Amino acid sequence: MRILKYDIEKVTGIPWKKKKSYRYLYRLACREDVIKKAFKRMRKGKTKRKDFQMAEENLDAWVKKIQEIILNTKPDGWQTDPQKRFKPVKHNPVIIKEFGKTRVVYVPTMVELWIQHVIVMILEPIIAGSSYPMSFSSFPGRGSLKGQRAIRRWIESGKGIRNFAQADIRHFYSHIQYKIVRKKLERRVKDNFFLHLIDVCMTYFPKEMPLGFYLSQWLANFMLQELDYDIKCKLKIAHHVRYMDNYTLADDNKKKLHQALLYIRQVLGKMRLRMKSDWQVFRFEYTKKNGKKTGRCVSAMGWLFYRSKVLIRKRILLHVERIARKLHKKEENGQRFPLGLCRGFVSLLGWITHSETYDWYLIHIKELVNVRKIKRIISKMTREVNRHAGMEKGTLQRLSLIHI
């Protein structure tokens, strides 16, 4: 099993050792080089936002400003400047509908997001270093493709895959209570100033983890770490994968799977969470001696797993075809292809590349869209965007020199 490696020594420039508990993390959060590196990580994909452009123009001054905010954010009783203290804003929720689901998202301000990135840069080696290797989603380098490869290896080995169990957590993010997460954090982080900084970030969310906050996904994953290891080590389940709040377990013994689901339900109850009522234990598909196929495929992480192949869920295929038809319609009307739509289409083709759905691609996609042409358009438009961005940056630098 490959465990996610994160070299904090390269990021923060200080020696780092894996420990049971960690101290002096607040000192790291106050360092200028850490704050600057957090900004570089934060700005990816957000360079068009005006507040980010303003911060980048005068980065050194903004780094000192964030440093002052963190230095003045301490528990009551410590001498600080109350005007410079970190004061989070109360956000209005944004409702987003995607893939048939309605999600409530909160968009943090640049200062909030910056401080969250500083916190995560320090928490990442602690959380990712001790995480269960087969927990995927919301960790860098651990997407659905890595989870798909893991389940494929189980099936190819042929051991411990007679029966499967699947379960989801009901409204996971909206039911996580921060006080429960904090108790778990206190065992690992022995730094009251650093914990107070996290407390301030979560001021307006005592009974939920806000979607849209960079800190939320890390704290949510940290909350389920102990349960992951219990399933594998205490219950001795043959195979176990967690994709954020979705559990997929495999074992030859069906009774063990039922006991595992009961244990998961009990532990979730202690954390004030609930398992969905649509949990299931079923026999994995196989061929009988008479040649008749029985059992079911496994549907997890957007993939459909069979003994000899891996397919994609229907709604993802429909989504790919819908975008292909949009691009085809724009080509027929002689309209310009939007860069975001082209990038989204090429990204979704990765699902087809890593599954046995090439025949579907030939019938439904190839006749509508020329993929090579789309890739050339992306390359050309990206060069144009980068050139204009470079020209704008040069103009701003010249203007600032004239002003000086």
Positions of predicted regions on the chain:
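Short, glycine/charge-rich beta-strand/loop segments that flank catalytic centers
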Residues: 57, 89-100, 132-146, 170-171, ...
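Conserved polymerase palm-domain catalytic core
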Residues: 149-244, 248-265, 282-283, 297, ...
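Non-catalytic, polymerase-adjacent accessory regions of viral genome-replication enzymes
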Residues: 1-68, 397-401
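Conserved pre-motif C helix in the palm subdomain of viral-like polymerases
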Residues: 101-132, 206-232
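Reverse-transcriptase-like RNA-dependent polymerase core
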Residues: 69-101, 114, 190-204
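Beta-rich nucleic-acid/ligand-interaction surfaces
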Residues: 137-146, 248-251, 281-290
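Right-hand nucleic-acid polymerase module
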Residues: 1-11, 108, 113, 117, ...
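Active-site-proximal segment of RNA-dependent polymerases
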Residues: 8, 12-25, 116, 120-177
